[in-house]
Swiss-Prot record:
Keywords: Cleavage on pair of basic residues, Disulfide bond, Ion channel impairing toxin, Nematocyst, Neurotoxin, Secreted, Signal, Toxin, Voltage-gated sodium channel impairing toxin. Its main location: secreted. Residues 1-19 form the signal peptide. It holds the Pfam family Toxin_4. This is Delta-thalatoxin-Hhe1a. GO terms for molecular function: sodium channel regulator activity; toxin activity. InterPro entries: Myo_ane_neurotoxin_sf. Disulfide bonds join 38-78, 40-68, 61-79.
């Protein structure tokens, strides 16, 4: 009986987590406002006068974005949308 309760609780947790996920839409990036700005390599030498054109992404850059700085580690990358 305890095994059935554990399985039932695990299934309910999986259902709750999957119901909270938002659909992945390429034209709508909700998390942009929550990102932190960062300085790309070509923004200029001084951080105070440079325009911060990149955003910090944990892990690696999102699909369709490019890594624009070489000074971030495996934990985070400075990324931006490719310039046309």
């Amino acid at each position: 009986m305890a095994y059935q309760k554990i399985v039932f609780v695990a299934l309910m947790l999986v259902l709750a987590v999957s119901a909270m996920r938002l659909p992945d839409q390429q034209d709508q990036d909700i998390s942009v406002a929550k990102r932190v700005a960062c300085k790309c390599d070509d923004d200029g030498p001084d951080i105070r006068s440079a325009t911060l054109t990149g955003t910090v992404d944990l892990g690696s850059c999102n699909e369709g974005w490019e890594k624009c700085a070489s000074y971030y580690t495996v934990v985070a990358d400075c990324c931006r949308r490719p310039r046309s």
